[in-house]
Amino acid sequence: MPKQLSPDQDKLHKNILRDRFLSSFKQPGRFRAELEKVKLILKRKGHE
């Protein structure tokens, strides 16, 4: 995977994360799992 995303890809990625985040509020059981997944992704990005 390329390390640098184009602005459009980055925006799309953020939108996907936001949509997942919002939809997870409707399913509280999945919410924590999604949150942990997002935290891991962000942590990984920070270390690259």
From Swiss-Prot:
Organism placement in taxonomy: Viruses, Duplodnaviria, Heunggongvirae, Uroviricota, Caudoviricetes
Protein name from the UniProt record: Uncharacterized 5.8 kDa protein
Domain of life: Viruses
Organism encoding this protein: Salmonella phage P22 (Bacteriophage P22)
